[in-house]
Swiss-Prot record:
Subcellular location: Cytoplasm
Species name: Blastobotrys adeninivorans (Yeast)
A GO biological process held by the record: L-leucine biosynthetic process
Name the UniProt record assigns to this protein: 3-isopropylmalate dehydrogenase
Subunit structure: Homodimer.
Cofactor note: Binds 1 Mg(2+) or Mn(2+) ion per subunit.
NCBIfam families: leuB (TIGR00169)
Annotated site location: Important for catalysis: 141, 190
Pathway the protein contributes to: Amino-acid biosynthesis; L-leucine biosynthesis; L-leucine from 3-methyl-2-oxobutanoate: step 3/4
Top-level EC class: oxidoreductase
Keywords for this protein: Amino-acid biosynthesis, Branched-chain amino acid biosynthesis, Cytoplasm, Leucine biosynthesis, Magnesium, Manganese, Metal-binding, NAD, Oxidoreductase
List of residues binding NAD(+): 77-88, 287-298
GO cellular component, one term: cytosol
Job of this protein: Catalyzes the oxidation of 3-carboxy-2-hydroxy-4-methylpentanoate (3-isopropylmalate) to 3-carboxy-4-methyl-2-oxopentanoate. The product decarboxylates to 4-methyl-2 oxopentanoate.
């Protein structure tokens, strides 16, 4: 079985973390000779701007469209500043062009050892386990806008259609139904103020009631949800579904609960993973960390993103489970980078996870 994976290493620590994820994927092929990965490296972000003038070259986009999945490192950095052409524009464009409408970001603890690293007390965060499902190609980030043209006025537009909301609701429902019993669904909005949120709430309610009556649906205002995530995060265990901007903010808030951005993976999908072959782009939740010295970045988020890719896009569930178990074992053994109060290097963590994967798959 051969799978084609586009590698978009990006900027600064991006090449370092994708290299460790590739190392772990290659460990799978050594333990499973019938599995083969074809890696094709392409440019995105600042590296692409330097080489081509564009943050997303046509070659990168076309190659990504033909692949089974895309694994991305990180984009951006002070070198490219806030000019007219910015690395982040490449990310927004590839999401839109590949119709990656659903962003999945799990928030949990891969090891009990991580509880004491959370900025919240361990007794508050223990047992936290939810996934944020963020609508990724609609809303205010893609709405009509007007820049300030010297008159001191600028505006952006938040717009959603019923079909866009139905689509992301079905993704959240599908994920909730993967557990037995099904997980509760939490829908976050600002329906007490925004017309777009009132449409959101109405559509989510109707979709769940008509298509997924077995699911428990809870509505929460986004500001209230932000407080709950700090006061009692496990109260929102299950699947959280929300709009593009709210999802951007709430998932970043959630990302600090486990203690480090270097732990958290993400997946952006273009369809339901009902056959475990959905096309997706996978990336860590952290940025490009331009100030970090070489070989110091935590590669676990990217390695876990690769595990999500194995499960959702490449139909390799056993191998995905092995990677996640290997990560837990490595953390338990204290082989962690400085952000987790360890002394191991990027490559040492990658080596340890790869070795554990081979043991588990033998």
């Amino acid at each position: 079985m051969s799978k084609n994976i586009i590698i978009l290493s990006g900027d600064h620590v991006g090449p370092e973390v994708t290299a460790e994820a590739i190392k772990v994927l290659e460990a799978i092929t050594q333990a499973r000779p019938n599995v083969k990965f074809n890696f094709d490296h392409k440019l995105i972000g600042g590296a692409a701007i330097d080489a081509t003038g564009s943050p997303l070259p046509d070659e990168t986009l076309e190659a990504s469209k033909k692949a089974d999945a895309v694994l991305l490192g990180a984009v951006g950095g002070p070198k490219w500043g806030t000019g007219a052409v910015r690395p982040e524009q490449g990310l927004l464009k590839i999401r839109k062009e590949l119709n990656l409408y659903a962003n999945l970001r799990p928030c949990n603890f891969m090891s009990e050892k991580l509880l004491d690293l959370s900025p919240l007390r361990s007794e508050i965060v223990k047992g936290t386990n939810f996934t944020v499902v963020r609508e990724l190609v609609g809303g205010i980030y893609f709405g009509t806008r007007k820049e300030d043209e010297g008159n001191g006025e600028a505006w952006d537009t938040e717009k959603y259609t019923v079909e866009e909301v139905k689509r992301i609701t079905r993704m959240a429902a599908f994920l909730a139904l993967q557990s037995n019993p099904p997980l509760p669904v939490w829908s976050l909005d600002k329906a007490n103020v925004l017309a777009s949120s009132r449409l959101w709430r109405k559509t989510v309610t109707e979709t769940i009631e008509k298509e997924f009556p077995q699911l428990t649906l809870n509505h929460q205002l986004i500001d209230s949800a932000a407080m709950i995530l700090i006061q009692n995060p496990s109260k929102m265990n299950g699947v959280i579904v929300t709009s593009n901007m709210f999802g951007d903010i709430i998932s970043d808030e959630a990302s600090v609960i486990p203690g480090s951005l270097g732990l958290l993976p993400s997946a952006s999908l273009s369809s339901l993973p009902d056959k475990n072959t959905a096309f997706g782009l996978y990336e860590p939740c952290h940025g490009s960390a331009p100030d970090l010295p070489p070989n110091k970045v935590n590669p676990i988020a990217t390695i876990l993103s690769a595990a999500m890719m194995l499960r959702l896009s490449l139909n390799l569930k056993e191998e995905a489970d092995a990677v996640e178990k290997a990560v837990s074992k490595v953390i338990d053994n204290g082989i962690v980078t400085a952000d987790l109060k360890g002394a191991s290097s990027t490559t040492e963590v990658g080596d340890a996870v790869a070795a554990e994967v081979q043991k588990l798959l033998k």
